[in-house]
């Protein structure tokens, strides 16, 4: 009886060990678990890519959306080694990783745009970048009273601070929240303010954003090269006639063949580029199209 009991105990131990090993999936290019840091202005397109990636492979990617500055800080602090940004790493940031014998790989996968929105009751739907920099510097505008950003450390805030020659957002005439959705809601409820968001929030709106879309206008921006105004449509972003177009990148600093490499390959693949195109953004390579050529021509007219 004792012999059978020992056999049963050993069998149970083996079962537990095997089960535990199976539950701990080792991360590889197309399987395992990882965390992906995302610039909050780019969250919708990344969510769309991750959803399909997880459905195709035995992988789980936890998305953490933060401001651009917070994403970079988390990347440096090793909170995660994979990020989606609207810029490449600076020389200083690259040197930090290279000193640790890690050589980040940057993969471009889409072209996005910064969108400027205003309340539907605002009659003026045209704006120039000079007007934006004037508002950043506290100067008055005939129609708009100020700017609203998602975060003082966001990529959009950083872009306009550099454009205006400022080190940080001014204390007067400029407001900030935590998310793009909050910016859209605020502009929908307040006249005379310009909201600064990622265009993908308009192309791929959540339920809360959809409820406010009929209360806002997306402004057309002057292109100084041809002196014409352009809306942030997919075609205008592709041709860069819309002056606030920008490139998107996957930054992989894992240093090994993990999900960072797999996800970067996926978003730049045929499937990933189709997802980008369908989302309203511009892929770096347009997906191929199959053309069916008929061997005979028939006349359908009677």
Locate the predicted segments by residue:
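Sec-dependent bacterial lipoprotein signal peptides
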Residues: 1-18
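Exported/periplasmic ABC-transporter solute-binding proteins
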Residues: 4, 20-58, 68-69, 73-76, ...
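Pocket-flanking alpha-helical
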Residues: 69-100, 206
């Amino acid at each position: 009886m004792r012999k059978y009991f020992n056999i049963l105990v050993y069998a149970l131990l083996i079962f537990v060990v095997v089960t535990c090993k199976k539950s701990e999936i080792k991360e590889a290019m197309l399987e395992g678990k990882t965390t992906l840091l995302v610039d909050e202005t780019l969250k919708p397109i990344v969510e769309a890519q991750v959803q399909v990636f997880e459905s195709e492979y035995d992988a789980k990617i936890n998305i953490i959306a933060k401001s651009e500055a917070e994403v970079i800080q988390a990347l440096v602090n090793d909170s995660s080694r994979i990020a989606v940004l609207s810029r490449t790493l600076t020389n200083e940031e690259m040197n930090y990783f290279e000193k640790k014998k890690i050589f980040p790989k940057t993969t471009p996968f889409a072209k996005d745009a910064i969108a400027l929105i205003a309340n539907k009751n605002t009659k003026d739907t045209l704006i120039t970048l000079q007007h934006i920099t004037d508002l950043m510097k506290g100067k008055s505008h005939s129609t708009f009273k100020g700017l609203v950003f998602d975060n003082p450390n966001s990529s959009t805030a950083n872009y306009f601070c550099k454009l205006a020659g400022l080190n940080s957002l001014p204390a007067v005439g400029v407001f900030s929240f935590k998310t793009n959705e909050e910016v859209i809601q605020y502009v929908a409820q307040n006249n005379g303010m310009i909201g600064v968001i990622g265009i993908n929030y308009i192309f791929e709106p959540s339920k809360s954003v959809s409820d406010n879309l009929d209360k806002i206008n997306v402004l057309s921006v002057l292109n100084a090269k041809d002196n014409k105004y352009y809306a942030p449509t997919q075609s205008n972003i592709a041709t860069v006639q819309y002056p606030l177009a920008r490139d998107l990148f996957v930054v992989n600093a894992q240093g090994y063949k993990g999900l960072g490499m797999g996800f970067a390959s996926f978003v730049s693949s045929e499937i990933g580029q189709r997802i980008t195109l369908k989302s309203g953004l511009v892929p770096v390579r347009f997906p191929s199209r199959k053309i069916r050529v008929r061997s005979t021509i028939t006349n359908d007219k009677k």
